[in-house]
């Protein structure tokens, strides 16, 4: 088991420089300006795994749409674990931290989307306690994208998607 520490980063975090080292200010500052948070795993005072959380719309280039969480939801996106540290349960542990924090903030649901062929991420999401409630089908024919959402499982509202700006 890896000796790691999990932290929550926002604009006022003393450890803010750690995420700048990983992704750079050009990407991070607009996220913090929107009030987003970063959940991260540290090993030897360096970020080795992270995921971002947003309460507002976030563009998803892969599907040419944006996820729009409801006012009582958060959306987790842009996850990454450095290859050397994969397989150490860092991803599920930061996902659990995000879920715990969402509960403290009285959010009803935390959304995360994983490509069906990403077995490792699907396993991590499951380990963290997420439940698959809906499937998004995406196809592209020539230059024409097509998306379809399955009906959500019982007692769940559908996820919301909007056009990219």
Regions inferred by a protein language model and the residue ranges of each:
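Residue-level recognition of the GNAT/N-acetyltransferase active site
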Residues: 82, 115
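Conserved N-terminal entry element of GNAT/NAT acetyltransferase domains
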Residues: 1-13
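Conserved catalytic-core motifs of GNAT/GCN5-like acyltransferases
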Residues: 131-145
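Conserved acetyl-CoA-binding loop-helix of GNAT-fold acetyltransferases
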Residues: 78-81, 87-104, 109, 123-127
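Conserved hydrophobic beta-strand within the GNAT/NAT acetyltransferase core sheet
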Residues: 110-114
